UniProtKB/Swiss-Prot annotation:
SMART domains the UniProt entry points to: HOX (SM00389)
Listed Pro residues bias regions: 90-103
Protein name: Homeobox protein Hox-A3
Mitochondrion in keyword set: no
Cell compartment(s), UniProt: Nucleus
GO molecular function, one term: RNA polymerase II cis-regulatory region sequence-specific DNA binding
Gene3D superfamilies xref list: Homeodomain-like (1.10.10.60)
DNA-binding residues (ranges): 168-227
GO annotation, biological process: anterior/posterior pattern specification; embryonic skeletal system morphogenesis
Length: 410
């Protein structure tokens, strides 16, 4: 296809009467020497292919073909130099090497072909020079890229502390044990360094100020995390006993430490115990079990419950069936179902510190057990000879403190 284009170009320029240095013009040469034109078009294909219309778009095709014909016609030396300068201004991709063997009609060609062959080594040398320069320049850029990528990969393998980016390529600082000891000692005395001390430590430890500042920032964050973890541990450890239900012995100790209680006699383990105390020491223990009012005078107190009241009973809203005794009697806290509760005097409109329990208008308080209390239980005033063992007739003025007896059935 290239041959056809160059034949066409030679036919196009056949009409021009362009005279070379040796006196030959193109009109006669095209007719007299067809083999020479064939050889010229074959031989100068690399020089013309260097400046094809595709690679050099700002040149007209006529100018390119004219430059090719000028080189083939062995003009004076300034014309090929201009073409070669144009070649160097726009370096194309490296051309294919020229054919090593030339066809035999070259020997019978005119002086123009001989001069073109003598001119050809300069063209090939220029092509090889451009071929050496342009890939060498390109290769140097690639080498620079490879060097930067290899250096960045080495730094990343060494371990980067900063996030990856083109601007930050600072490697992770490795502190020696002596430096760490000095830094920890300084942090123990002062968590925030002033600048003079930081400069002094930087000179002492052979570090930069920035490294010391960043180490102190990280150490403060670690200290804050440790303190937060310790605080959570202590708070969870301190709250766990409070959330757990109070055992009977602990509840008894709490009641005895708050108020001096009288001695309680041994009893059947299924029945709760009653502790006598003065009226002015009445208080509401934060439990949800109201105690009934006792209708006995203090020397003849009875137990406020029966064996039917089990420790697992649940408190219900107050009801009006079978209220206890007469007003203006002393209230006493009652140990019912593993917790101490207290009975309030019925003389005034006092309430428990409980949100879901109200005070009945009659002034009498009642509670319901796990099963309703049957009618055969004795709810009237105590007789002078109680069924259960009486409490000690001595009041808390004796100062004796008695713990609640341990229940064996729980």
């Amino acid at each position: 296809m290239q041959k056809a284009t160059y034949y066409d170009s030679s036919a196009i320029f056949g009409g021009y009467t362009y005279q070379g240095a040796n006196g030959f013009n193109y009109n006669a040469s095209q007719q007299q020497y067809p083999p020479s034109s064939h050889v010229e078009s074959d031989y100068h294909r690399p020089a013309c292919s260097l400046q094809s219309p595709g690679t050099v778009p700002h040149h007209k095709p006529n100018d390119i073909n004219e430059s090719c014909m000028r080189t083939s016609a062995s003009q004076p030396s300034h014309h090929p130099v201009i073409a070669e300068q144009q070649q160097q201004k726009q370096p194309p991709p490296p051309p294919p090497p020229p054919p090593p063997s030339v066809s035999p009609p070259q020997n019978t060609s005119s002086n123009s072909t001989q001069s073109s062959t003598s001119k050809n080594p300069t063209l090939t040398s220029q092509a090889t020079i451009s071929k050496q320069i342009f890939p060498w320049m390109k290769e140097s850029r690639q080498n620079a890229k490879q060097k930067t990528s290899s250096s960045s990969s080495v730094e990343s393998s060494a371990g980067e502390k900063s996030p990856p980016g083109p601007a930050s390529k600072r490697a992770r600082t490795a502190y020696t044990s002596a430096q760490l000891v000095e830094l920890e000692k300084e942090f123990h005395f002062n968590r925030y360094l002033c600048r003079p001390r930081r400069v002094e430590m930087a000179n002492l430890l052979n570090l930069t100020e920035r490294q010391i500042k960043i180490w102190f920032q990280n150490r403060r964050m670690k200290y804050k995390k440790d303190q937060k973890a310790k605080g959570m541990l202590t708070s969870s450890g301190g709250q766990s006993p409070c959330r757990s239900p109070i055992p009977p012995s602990a509840a008894g100790g709490y009641a005895n430490s708050m108020h001096s209680l009288a001695t309680s006699a041994p009893y059947d383990p299924h029945s709760p115990t009653s502790f006598s105390k003065p009226h002015q020491n009445a208080y509401a223990i934060p439990t949800s079990y109201p105690g009934p009012l006792n209708s006995c005078p203090p020397p003849q107190k009875r137990y406020a419950g029966t064996a039917a009241v089990t420790p697992e009973y649940d408190t219900h809203p107050l009801q009006g069936n079978g209220g206890y005794g007469t007003p203006h009697l002393q209230g006493s806290p009652v140990y019912v179902g593993g917790n101490f509760v207290e009975s309030m005097p019925s003389s005034g409109p006092s309430l428990f510190s409980l949100t879901h329990l109200g005070h009945p208008p009659s002034g009498n308080m009642d509670y319901n057990g796990a099963g309703p209390m049957t009618s055969n239980h004795h709810h009237g005033p105590c007789d002078p000879h109680p069924t259960y063992t009486d409490l000690s007739s001595h009041h808390p003025s004796q100062g004796r403190i008695q713990e609640a007896p341990k229940l064996t059935h729980l």
